[in-house]
């Protein structure tokens, strides 16, 4: 059974799935349809072009050290080959995951103690976009061996719609932060 995460909540993935070695991080979203002006009233609603992006950042001793440790639409694979971004979806069209990151936990070099997954809206300031303008937004973690969804975080369930980024962190060992 998948755990539905709330802001600030922690979950032990190894406790949920012993021997976890491969995970899929999935990001999905749909633009909220909006009506603007006279023409929109004639032709119906139109979804805003909102581009959410998933990024994985590998940390050493909890710190960011090198730009090559960032895996995203502009750098699809980590130099170790253990973290791969499967491509950029610019619109959120379609069902299910719109972007995916695959992580082979068993082969991540020992010097990395954490992987932070960041979700942001591309060019959000220029486009004046925020999470309140999207619906059905989620990030989820799936056991790569069993395809079982382990946990899911609803990005649309926000107290504040003024946010344009969010993150999930995974650690090799328990952390107090």
Residue ranges of each PLM-predicted region?
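Intrinsic-disorder/low-complexity signal
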Residues: 1-162, 166-172, 177
């Amino acid at each position: 059974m998948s755990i539905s995460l709330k802001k600030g909540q922690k979950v032990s993935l190894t406790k949920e799935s012993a021997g976890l070695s491969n995970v899929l991080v999935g990001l999905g979203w749909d633009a909220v349809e909006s009506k603007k002006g006279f023409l929109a009233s004639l032709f119906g609603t139109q979804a805003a072009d909102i581009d959410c992006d998933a990024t994985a950042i590998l940390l050493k001793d909890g710190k960011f050290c090198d730009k090559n440790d960032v895996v995203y639409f502009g750098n699809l694979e980590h130099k170790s080959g253990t973290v791969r971004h499967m491509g950029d979806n610019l619109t959120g069209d379609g069902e299910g995951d719109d972007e995916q990151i695959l992580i082979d936990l068993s082969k991540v070099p020992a010097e990395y103690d954490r992987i932070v997954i960041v979700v942001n809206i591309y060019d959000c300031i220029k486009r004046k976009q925020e999470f309140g303008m999207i619906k059905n937004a989620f990030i989820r973690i799936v056991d790569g061996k069993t395809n079982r969804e382990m946990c899911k975080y609803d990005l649309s369930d926000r107290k504040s719609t003024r946010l344009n980024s969010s993150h999930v962190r995974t650690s090799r060992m328990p952390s107090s932060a």
